Each structure stands twice: as structure tokens, then as C-alpha cells.
Amino acid sequence: MIRVGINGYGTIGKRVADAVAAQPDMTVAGVAKTSPNFEATQARKRGFDLYTAVEDRADQFPAAGIETAGPVDDLIADSDVVVDATPSGVGAENRSRYAAHDTPAIYQGGEDASVADVSFNARANFEAAADADHVRVVSCNTTGLSRLLAPLREQYGIEKVRATLVRRGGDPGQTDRGPINDILPDPITIPSHHGPDVNTIFPDLDIDTLGMKVPATLMHMHSINVTLERDPDAADVRDVLAGQSRIMLLDDDLGIDGTGPLKEYAQDMGRPRGDLWENCLWGESVTMDGRDFYCFQAIHQESDVVPENVDAVRAIAGDADAAESIATTNDALGI
């Protein structure tokens, strides 16, 4: 069993902890929190050993009636792999701590690519992370783009990618995010950071990305145009995408016309926290015009990187190849 520590038990960390706990070959060594909030309480209720991430705040946990197992360094030392799910920038600060314990670490997409030996997407470059000490799972949007582009590239070749990302202003629990009543080019300059981030997975890919922020919390939306090297018909492309385990091709007759019904669909399916780990791609939007491919896809920013973190653990451990790991993760989560 691979012992996985999770440093940071917020939006991503708590989901990764549950996903790791569901795997047949992994166990949660513990989770670390900076403060004794409701998430810390729930971590203990779920049976996870809780470690304190900030020494100066360690006494706040017993004062709040929350039992802890020790400082985060104890968790790192006791883990085969640590998933760093701390806020952007904190992971880079933690890098030396993981190195001091000789514990491999997985970082999130909010960190600069230089924090890791390799940026990771299970569908696109699983083998690149084999035996690495520091791996960065790319961001939610880059994950969604990589999952889509990998099969298109393999089947048809790609000449050029153009993607407009309509991004949610904040997660449902982020009361300090916005905009509230505005539509923002974000950034105003082109490209947005997503294109260069995709190039950490596909270094030679020609891609332009534009970003926007809108007053929504549920999901991101991508408007995609890819000029392929071949000119397949739309039905053929739909079949290829339908065969991807982490692309949910939405049938027309489902009546899902936006991200609101999508989240309702996830809840009706019994998904934990209403999570959608897959790209949600409207089958009806798949269009070919000559060699130009078009589609719309929605990305659940709180959860699509979760299975990627699980696969990154196996890649580092060297216990499975890409197909085996993806299948095991998917089966355990119900993807």
C-alpha cells in the first residue's frame, strides 16, 4: 500500500484524500491543516489523522477540541508520497521541506512549472513522471485541455489550437472572489497563461488561449477551435472522444444546456460533493469545417484534477503504467 500524505485539506486536498482512501493500493497517511475550521473537524470525522501545518497555530486545535497527531513534518516523514494541496505559492515554499525528508511530492497547477521535475497529465504524459521526486499536476483548465488535445493529436495531428476560456469568478465557498456584476478579460493580454501551461505537457504544440472571468461559481466553459492535420467527419471525431474515459460526451437528449443542469446531473448521479471529474463535452457542439474542429466543454474546477493526483502518485511509485493506473482510479471513483 502506498502511504499518501495530503498537506492542505481545502477544496482540492479533501477531495484527493477521499479519492486516495477509495483506491485499492493506497492509504491516507494523514492530512495537514493550518487552522481548526470545519474542514479540520470533518477530516477527523472521516477518520483521517490530522497534522498541524503551522507551528504557531498548533495550540489552536486542542483549544477547539480537535485532536492532532503532530506537526506536518511527522506526516511528511511517514508518507511514501505527499500531495501538496496548499494555496498557490505555498507549495514552492514547502519544496525544501519535502526534499529534506526525501519524500516525493506532487504539487498543484497554481505553482510555477519550475517547482517540479515534470508537469503531469495522466492521459498525455504519464510515463514522464516515473520515479520523479517532484511532479506538478497542471491546473484544472490545462487538465481539461490536455485530455481533449491528446486523442485529437494522436488520431488526426494538430496544426493549431485556439481556445477561449470563460472562467468562473470563484468557487462556491470563496466569498472573497469575483467579479459580482462584470465580465473581465483576464488577462487582457494574449495569450492567457493556459497556453504556455499546455506547452509544459505538449512542448511543440502551437496554441493560443484567451481568458475571461464571469460572475459564476459552478464551472469553467471552454470554446475550442483546433485546426487538424486531417479532415475527419464530425461523427468520427465524436466516436474518438466518446472513447475517452475522462471525457463525458453529453448526449443531446439529456437536455443539459448549461453548467447548472450539469451540476444537478452530478448530484442526481450521486457524485460526492456533486463532483464532475471528467471533461463535460456537448456532443452536439462537435463540428468539423474542413480541417477545423469546434466544440464546447465545461470543466469542474474543484474536482477534475483529483483523479490526476491519484495517477501521479502511481506514476511516482512506478507501480502501474498509464492505462492500468487510469483504469484503477476510474473504477475506484466510479468514473
Curated annotation (Swiss-Prot):
Instruction: Cite the SUPFAM superfamilies for this sequence.
Output: Glyceraldehyde-3-phosphate dehydrogenase-like, C-terminal domain (SSF55347), NAD(P)-binding Rossmann-fold domains (SSF51735)
Q: Which reaction does it catalyse?
A: D-glyceraldehyde 3-phosphate + phosphate + NADP(+) = (2R)-3-phospho-glyceroyl phosphate + NADPH + H(+); D-glyceraldehyde 3-phosphate + phosphate + NAD(+) = (2R)-3-phospho-glyceroyl phosphate + NADH + H(+)
Compartments it resides in: Cytoplasm
Q: In which pathway does it act?
A: Carbohydrate degradation; glycolysis; pyruvate from D-glyceraldehyde 3-phosphate: step 1/5
- Tell me what this protein is called: Glyceraldehyde-3-phosphate dehydrogenase
Reading the lineage from the top rank, the first entry is Archaea
**Enzyme Commission (EC) number:** 1.2.1.59
Where does this protein come from, organism-wise? Halobacterium salinarum (strain ATCC 700922 / JCM 11081 / NRC-1)
Sites where the protein binds D-glyceraldehyde 3-phosphate? S139, C140, N141, H194, G195
Protein's UniProt keywords contain NADP: yes
| Cellular component terms (Gene Ontology) | cytoplasm
Question: What interactions and quaternary structure are annotated?
Answer: Homotetramer.
| UniProt family annotation | Belongs to the glyceraldehyde-3-phosphate dehydrogenase family.
